[in-house]
Amino acid sequence: MAVLNKGLAIPRLKPEQAGMLKTEIADINVFNNDPWEAMLIYSQVIEDNKKNDLGDEVKLKKAKLGYYMGNFSWAKAQLDVLKASTSKLTANDAMELSLMIGNNLNLDTTAIPLTMFARADLLFFQSKNQQAMVVLDSLGTLFPYNPLVDDILFRKAKIEIQNNNDTLAARYLEQIIDNFGYDLLGDDALFMLAELYNFKLNKKEEAKALYLDMLTRHPGSIFTEESRGKYRELRNLYPDKKTEKESKETIFMESPETNEF
């Protein structure tokens, strides 16, 4: 943190550069369990970056921090505003977290599952992966029928990827695709599994099939264009004879700009 503070002392530092340094300092405060200081710094960065993407990125961080702290209604209100962000990634992340919070707040049940899940998310952010996994396991055991089942599997997959346990991560993602494939995290899980197969597990044919699945099952996903490009690349490297079914499917997946798949 001392290095970051020295960076802030550099003369004629641009506001956005200063904002990036302050954001890292705030992240460290979250990591070190000092949420109120982090909240204050995030607010300063937002105030100084109202007209650029950094402002929205930090608004998302601030909303997530409120979620970590259990202020679910407040966090959801901030996230709902961010769903209109010009950054597709920020808007998508805000939408997913807002829907997850809303789906659980609207239930006529205890808030304990959501509180536990938020705790696990904070531990994961703090790189306390083993502790996060313990909380997720406890949540699944204590509340086996809560609507967070697919979220729990997705968080476990992300933890195992960070732990370099890619095969185990793939199993969690496969469970989401098989059982919750058309729910909120369906496209996230499908794309993440395709990336694992493509770059970590060296299963190129399986990756190619999953990228194609993304185009047919989730045409409106933020991952669609990237999946199309990677499918084309793998198709060129690993060509196969099209089945009649695949030929019909690809008619609906042509890129409007190029009129080709």
What are these model-derived regions, one by one?
Residues M1-F261:
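Acidic, polar-rich low-complexity tracts and alpha-helical solenoid repeat scaffolds
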